[in-house]
Design a protein with these regions (language model features):
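Glycine-rich phosphate-binding loop of ATP-dependent small-molecule kinases
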Residues: 1-205
Length: 205
Protein backbone atom coordinates (compact mmCIF):
# COMPACT_ATOMS: atom_id res chain seq x y z
CA UNK A 1 0.00 0.00 0.00
CA UNK A 2 1.23 3.49 -0.81
CA UNK A 3 2.60 5.18 2.30
CA UNK A 4 0.90 8.32 3.56
CA UNK A 5 2.84 11.45 2.76
CA UNK A 6 1.46 14.54 4.54
CA UNK A 7 2.60 16.67 1.62
CA UNK A 8 -0.05 14.96 -0.53
CA UNK A 9 -2.71 16.62 1.59
CA UNK A 10 -1.29 20.11 1.92
CA UNK A 11 -3.04 22.99 0.20
CA UNK A 12 -0.90 25.94 -0.78
CA UNK A 13 -2.37 28.87 -2.68
CA UNK A 14 -5.42 28.66 -4.90
CA UNK A 15 -6.56 25.23 -6.06
CA UNK A 16 -9.04 23.67 -8.48
CA UNK A 17 -10.86 20.85 -6.69
CA UNK A 18 -11.90 19.31 -10.00
CA UNK A 19 -8.24 18.56 -10.68
CA UNK A 20 -7.50 16.97 -7.31
CA UNK A 21 -8.11 13.20 -6.89
CA UNK A 22 -10.73 12.21 -4.33
CA UNK A 23 -9.01 8.91 -3.51
CA UNK A 24 -5.25 8.78 -3.03
CA UNK A 25 -5.32 5.07 -2.25
CA UNK A 26 -7.50 3.75 -5.04
CA UNK A 27 -6.90 0.03 -5.53
CA UNK A 28 -5.56 -0.65 -2.04
CA UNK A 29 -7.16 -3.61 -0.28
CA UNK A 30 -9.45 -3.10 2.70
CA UNK A 31 -7.06 -5.16 4.83
CA UNK A 32 -4.18 -2.85 3.93
CA UNK A 33 -6.25 0.21 4.79
CA UNK A 34 -7.30 -1.33 8.11
CA UNK A 35 -3.70 -2.11 8.97
CA UNK A 36 -2.69 1.47 8.23
CA UNK A 37 -5.58 2.80 10.34
CA UNK A 38 -4.55 0.62 13.30
CA UNK A 39 -1.03 2.07 13.17
CA UNK A 40 -2.37 5.63 12.97
CA UNK A 41 -4.69 5.04 15.95
CA UNK A 42 -1.84 3.68 18.07
CA UNK A 43 0.49 6.52 17.15
CA UNK A 44 -2.11 9.18 17.88
CA UNK A 45 -2.91 7.61 21.24
CA UNK A 46 0.78 7.73 22.17
CA UNK A 47 1.05 11.35 21.06
CA UNK A 48 -2.00 12.22 23.13
CA UNK A 49 -0.26 10.96 26.27
CA UNK A 50 2.88 12.95 25.48
CA UNK A 51 0.95 16.13 24.79
CA UNK A 52 -1.12 15.79 27.96
CA UNK A 53 2.02 15.39 30.06
CA UNK A 54 3.68 18.35 28.34
CA UNK A 55 0.62 20.56 28.96
CA UNK A 56 1.83 23.33 26.66
CA UNK A 57 -0.33 22.98 23.55
CA UNK A 58 -3.88 22.10 22.63
CA UNK A 59 -4.84 20.65 19.24
CA UNK A 60 -7.84 21.83 17.25
CA UNK A 61 -8.83 19.53 14.39
CA UNK A 62 -11.21 21.16 11.90
CA UNK A 63 -13.24 18.86 9.65
CA UNK A 64 -15.11 20.41 6.76
CA UNK A 65 -16.86 18.62 3.92
CA UNK A 66 -20.12 17.91 2.16
CA UNK A 67 -22.80 15.65 3.59
CA UNK A 68 -21.79 11.95 3.46
CA UNK A 69 -18.11 12.86 3.00
CA UNK A 70 -17.16 10.78 6.05
CA UNK A 71 -16.56 13.26 8.87
CA UNK A 72 -18.52 11.27 11.47
CA UNK A 73 -16.93 7.97 10.41
CA UNK A 74 -13.45 9.44 10.71
CA UNK A 75 -14.16 10.72 14.20
CA UNK A 76 -15.45 7.30 15.31
CA UNK A 77 -12.56 5.35 13.83
CA UNK A 78 -9.53 7.57 14.34
CA UNK A 79 -10.27 8.69 17.88
CA UNK A 80 -11.64 5.48 19.38
CA UNK A 81 -8.24 4.65 20.92
CA UNK A 82 -8.00 8.07 22.58
CA UNK A 83 -8.53 8.67 26.26
CA UNK A 84 -12.05 10.17 26.09
CA UNK A 85 -11.16 12.70 28.79
CA UNK A 86 -8.59 14.21 26.45
CA UNK A 87 -10.71 14.86 23.37
CA UNK A 88 -14.00 16.68 22.81
CA UNK A 89 -16.03 16.66 19.61
CA UNK A 90 -18.19 19.65 18.73
CA UNK A 91 -20.76 19.53 15.93
CA UNK A 92 -21.89 23.04 15.11
CA UNK A 93 -25.51 23.22 14.03
CA UNK A 94 -27.65 26.27 13.31
CA UNK A 95 -26.86 28.88 16.01
CA UNK A 96 -29.34 28.90 18.89
CA UNK A 97 -30.85 32.01 20.46
CA UNK A 98 -28.07 32.37 23.03
CA UNK A 99 -25.34 32.03 20.41
CA UNK A 100 -27.02 34.62 18.21
CA UNK A 101 -26.73 37.13 21.04
CA UNK A 102 -22.94 36.98 20.59
CA UNK A 103 -20.63 37.37 17.62
CA UNK A 104 -20.45 34.40 15.25
CA UNK A 105 -17.06 33.18 16.55
CA UNK A 106 -18.11 33.20 20.22
CA UNK A 107 -19.34 29.61 20.32
CA UNK A 108 -16.15 28.44 18.61
CA UNK A 109 -14.01 30.17 21.24
CA UNK A 110 -15.93 28.32 23.96
CA UNK A 111 -15.17 24.99 22.30
CA UNK A 112 -11.40 25.47 21.96
CA UNK A 113 -9.26 22.74 23.57
CA UNK A 114 -7.55 23.14 26.90
CA UNK A 115 -3.78 22.76 26.98
CA UNK A 116 -2.85 19.10 26.67
CA UNK A 117 -6.15 18.18 25.03
CA UNK A 118 -7.75 17.77 21.61
CA UNK A 119 -10.92 19.34 20.23
CA UNK A 120 -12.58 18.28 16.99
CA UNK A 121 -14.85 20.66 15.10
CA UNK A 122 -17.27 18.65 12.98
CA UNK A 123 -18.18 21.45 10.62
CA UNK A 124 -16.37 24.59 11.56
CA UNK A 125 -16.25 28.36 11.77
CA UNK A 126 -15.94 28.31 7.96
CA UNK A 127 -19.68 27.67 7.81
CA UNK A 128 -19.99 31.39 8.51
CA UNK A 129 -18.58 32.16 5.07
CA UNK A 130 -19.93 29.09 3.27
CA UNK A 131 -23.53 28.35 4.23
CA UNK A 132 -24.31 31.98 4.98
CA UNK A 133 -22.90 33.05 1.63
CA UNK A 134 -25.27 30.68 -0.14
CA UNK A 135 -28.10 31.72 2.20
CA UNK A 136 -27.30 35.34 3.15
CA UNK A 137 -30.72 35.64 4.77
CA UNK A 138 -29.25 33.71 7.73
CA UNK A 139 -27.06 36.74 8.45
CA UNK A 140 -30.20 38.69 9.32
CA UNK A 141 -30.57 36.53 12.46
CA UNK A 142 -27.32 37.99 13.83
CA UNK A 143 -28.74 41.53 14.25
CA UNK A 144 -25.58 43.16 12.96
CA UNK A 145 -25.18 46.95 12.90
CA UNK A 146 -25.63 48.39 9.43
CA UNK A 147 -27.30 45.23 8.10
CA UNK A 148 -31.02 45.93 7.82
CA UNK A 149 -31.69 43.80 4.74
CA UNK A 150 -29.92 41.17 2.63
CA UNK A 151 -28.96 43.82 0.08
CA UNK A 152 -26.79 45.47 2.74
CA UNK A 153 -24.45 42.46 2.69
CA UNK A 154 -21.72 43.58 0.32
CA UNK A 155 -18.66 41.74 -1.07
CA UNK A 156 -16.60 43.66 1.48
CA UNK A 157 -18.67 42.07 4.25
CA UNK A 158 -17.37 38.64 3.21
CA UNK A 159 -13.82 39.90 2.84
CA UNK A 160 -14.02 41.25 6.39
CA UNK A 161 -15.30 37.91 7.69
CA UNK A 162 -12.48 36.02 6.01
CA UNK A 163 -10.00 38.39 7.62
CA UNK A 164 -11.69 37.93 11.01
CA UNK A 165 -11.42 34.15 10.69
CA UNK A 166 -7.76 34.40 9.73
CA UNK A 167 -7.15 36.63 12.75
CA UNK A 168 -9.03 34.18 14.98
CA UNK A 169 -6.80 31.31 13.86
CA UNK A 170 -3.66 33.43 14.15
CA UNK A 171 -4.60 34.48 17.67
CA UNK A 172 -5.26 30.97 18.97
CA UNK A 173 -2.16 29.60 17.21
CA UNK A 174 0.05 32.20 18.89
CA UNK A 175 -1.45 31.20 22.24
CA UNK A 176 -0.76 27.48 22.06
CA UNK A 177 -3.50 25.94 19.92
CA UNK A 178 -2.23 23.86 17.01
CA UNK A 179 -4.81 24.14 14.22
CA UNK A 180 -5.09 21.22 11.79
CA UNK A 181 -7.62 21.69 8.99
CA UNK A 182 -9.01 18.91 6.80
CA UNK A 183 -11.38 19.19 3.87
CA UNK A 184 -13.13 15.98 2.81
CA UNK A 185 -13.03 15.97 -0.97
CA UNK A 186 -15.85 13.87 -2.43
CA UNK A 187 -16.85 13.31 -6.04
CA UNK A 188 -20.46 13.96 -7.04
CA UNK A 189 -20.85 10.34 -8.12
CA UNK A 190 -19.58 8.99 -4.81
CA UNK A 191 -21.83 11.37 -2.89
CA UNK A 192 -24.81 10.18 -4.94
CA UNK A 193 -23.99 6.55 -4.11
CA UNK A 194 -23.67 7.32 -0.41
CA UNK A 195 -26.92 9.28 -0.31
CA UNK A 196 -28.75 6.40 -2.01
CA UNK A 197 -27.17 3.94 0.42
CA UNK A 198 -28.27 6.09 3.34
CA UNK A 199 -31.84 6.24 2.01
CA UNK A 200 -31.89 2.46 1.63
CA UNK A 201 -30.70 2.02 5.21
CA UNK A 202 -33.46 4.33 6.48
CA UNK A 203 -36.09 2.41 4.52
CA UNK A 204 -34.89 -0.89 5.99
CA UNK A 205 -35.32 0.47 9.51
Amino acid sequence: MKSINPDDFKVIGKIDLSKIPTNLFNGASEDAKEEKLDKVQTKLSELQDVMYAHNRYGVLICLQGMDTSGKDSLIREVFKEFNPRGVEVHSFKTPNSTELEHDYLWRHYLALPEKGKFAVFNRTHYENVLVTRVHPEYIMNENLPGIEKVEDITPQFWEDRLEQINNFEKHISQNGTIVLKFYFHLSKEEQRKRLLRRLEEVEHH
